[in-house]
């Protein structure tokens, strides 16, 4: 309860004062020349074991972002944080992200997600690049990048995402026009959840699920339910060692394994179907990411399945919540919304003919997505296990130390972003070409950046483009939405939005 009370106080006060933020943003320029030892680094106060016990008891750490943000205000831009038997270094400045990338090895190392790894080990499944480390990670990653992350790959799968985004927009517009008032107020979260799964599934496997504007099959609904159960059980299990949780939470482990069984079975069916089609005849045109990976034959079918399952799981909530928060911010910032609408309408004909042009002809909309991820980073932190000794904020960091970059605090630092509480996409266009390469890193950095980032960006960009062309988004809620950490940073609740047809 003490942790929650402290977090509520933190919510009530303004974000970093300008004076304190300037100190955080410029401290590196005033540090003494002699590098300080690791032991001299400020340490977050509190008993490491009591803190861990409270997390276990509450099955989560909802206010982690607020407590870490408060600690940066109190201790400065770097501190040590001990939790149970583990320790880490927390940082929040772009310069430290750059230094971490500079010392990346050929195999940048990060911590694994134990519930996901435990399932794969128990069932004998391979791990994908999200869970792998070492040479096997690099082998997989180098063969996945050309078909998933490269500009050429984006050009090929983007029209498929565009088709789903158009269907979503048309279905929503139809519902709005069916209302005599020409408007519709609803909880849009389930619809956007369906959209992201539909778009990802089409790009990955070349198959529609019928979740957007159609009647989904029972198999699609089972797959959808399995994803929901998997995410919920992940949060319940991720903070406790399996050696303990297997006795305290056997029912949750059972649900977690059964959900993954359903997800992998679905992936098996999709891949087998593609494999049979390829054996019959080679397609004359692009059909899906997985089909290209199978044709290339540089990865085994099991490795392709493992990575496609990670892409499927990783492309849902991480896309849904930025879309929801962007719609919310546009609803309470109508001037920004109108500027984006004008941009989309001006580019509509060009994008309709060549959907790939959405990546170049919607700069303000792309900036709006950056602004959303600055304020509401889905991944709360980035992490690296230091592969060699380095110096951060004039402190020696030994090799093997876990370092976490907290994006919530980075994005709300007034020394980096004037008036950080303000939703202002234009700020990203104003700083283009200014050398601020590490101000926007919600998808990670270097070789370990998110493999599915281009797919996620395309899904968000195209949905907003098509919706804003036809519909005005409104809300009665002007207050900030409380965010909670639950494996990802997500809204604790989401207000109803009103969509109104535009003449």
Curated annotation (Swiss-Prot):
Consequence of changing residue 158 to P: In AH4; highly decreases steroid 11-beta-hydroxylase activity
Result, substituting residue 314 to R: In AH4; abolishes steroid 11-beta-hydroxylase activity
Known outcome of mutating residue 332 to Q: In AH4; non-classic; highly decreases steroid 11-beta-hydroxylase activity
Impact noted for substituting residue 135 to S: In AH4; highly decreases steroid 11-beta-hydroxylase activity
Effect of residue 159 to L: In AH4; decreases steroid 11-beta-hydroxylase activity
The protein's enzyme class: oxidoreductase
Gene Ontology molecular function: any one: corticosterone 18-monooxygenase activity
GO cellular-component term (any): mitochondrial inner membrane
Keywords, sorted A to Z: Congenital adrenal hyperplasia, Disease variant, Heme, Iron, Lipid biosynthesis, Lipid metabolism, Membrane, Metal-binding, Mitochondrion, Mitochondrion inner membrane, Monooxygenase, Oxidoreductase, Steroid biosynthesis, Steroidogenesis, Transit peptide
Disorder: Adrenal hyperplasia 4: A form of congenital adrenal hyperplasia, a common recessive disease due to defective synthesis of cortisol. Congenital adrenal hyperplasia is characterized by androgen excess leading to ambiguous genitalia in affected females, rapid somatic growth during childhood in both sexes with premature closure of the epiphyses and short adult stature. Hyperaldosteronism, familial, 1: A disorder characterized by hypertension, variable hyperaldosteronism, and abnormal adrenal steroid production, including 18-oxocortisol and 18-hydroxycortisol. There is significant phenotypic heterogeneity, and some individuals never develop hypertension.
Protein name per the record: Cytochrome P450 11B1, mitochondrial
Organism (species): Homo sapiens (Human)
């Amino acid at each position: 309860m003490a942790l929650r009370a402290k977090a509520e106080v933190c919510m009530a006060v303004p974000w970093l004062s300008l004076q304190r933020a300037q100190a955080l943003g410029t401290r590196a320029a005033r540090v003494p020349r002699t590098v300080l030892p690791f032991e001299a680094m400020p340490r977050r106060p509190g008993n490491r074991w009591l803190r861990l016990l409270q997390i276990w008891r509450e099955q989560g750490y909802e206010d982690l972002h607020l407590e870490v943000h408060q600690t940066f205000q109190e201790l400065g831009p770097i501190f040590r944080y001990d939790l149970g038997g583990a320790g880490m270094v927390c940082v929040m400045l772009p310069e430290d992200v750059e230094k971490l990338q500079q010392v990346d090895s050929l195999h940048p190392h990060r911590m694994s997600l134990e519930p996901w790894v435990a399932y794969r080990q128990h069932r004998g499944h391979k791990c994908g690049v999200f869970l792998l480390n070492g040479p096997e990670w690099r082998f997989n990653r180098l063969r996945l990048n050309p078909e998933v992350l490269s500009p050429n790959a984006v050009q090929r799968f983007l029209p498929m995402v565009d088709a789903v985004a158009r269907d979503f927009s048309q279905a929503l517009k139809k519902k709005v026009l069916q209302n005599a008032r020409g408007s519709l107020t609803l909880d849009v979260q389930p619809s956007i959840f369906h959209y992201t799964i539909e778009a990802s599934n089409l790009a990955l496997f070349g198959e529609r699920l019928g979740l957007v504007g159609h009647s989904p099959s029972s198999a699609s609904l089972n797959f959808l339910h399995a994803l929901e159960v998997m995410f919920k059980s992940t949060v319940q299990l991720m903070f406790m060692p399996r050696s303990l949780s297997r006795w305290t939470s056997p029912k949750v482990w059972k649900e977690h394994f059964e959900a993954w069984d359903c997800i992998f079975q679905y992936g098996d069916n999709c891949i087998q179907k593609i494999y049979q089609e390829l054996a019959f005849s080679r397609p004359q045109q692009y059909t899906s990411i997985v089909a290209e990976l199978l044709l290339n034959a540089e990865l085994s079918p099991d490795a392709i399945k493992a990575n496609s399952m990670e892409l499927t799981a990783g492309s849902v909530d991480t896309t849904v919540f930025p879309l929801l928060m962007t719609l919310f911010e546009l609803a309470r910032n109508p001037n920004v919304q109108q500027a984006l609408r004008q941009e989309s309408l001006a580019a509509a004909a060009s994008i309709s003919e060549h959907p790939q042009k959405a990546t170049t002809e919607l700069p303000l909309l792309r900036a709006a997505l950056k602004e959303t991820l600055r304020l509401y980073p889905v991944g709360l932190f980035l992490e690296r296990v230091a592969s060699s000794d380095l110096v951060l904020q004039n402190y020696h960091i030994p090799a093997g130390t876990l370092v976490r970059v907290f994006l919530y605090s980075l994005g709300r630092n007034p020394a980096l972003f004037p008036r950080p509480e303000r939703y202002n996409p234009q700020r990203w266009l104003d700083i283009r070409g200014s050398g601020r390469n590490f101000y926007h890193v919600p998808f990670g950095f270097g070789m370990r950046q998110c493999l599915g980032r281009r797919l996620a960006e395309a899904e968000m960009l195209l949905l907003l483009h098509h919706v804003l062309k036809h519909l005005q988004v409104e809300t009665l809620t002007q207050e900030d939405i409380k965010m909670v950490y639950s494996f990802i940073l997500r809204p604790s609740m989401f207000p109803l939005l009103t969509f109104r047809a535009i003449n």
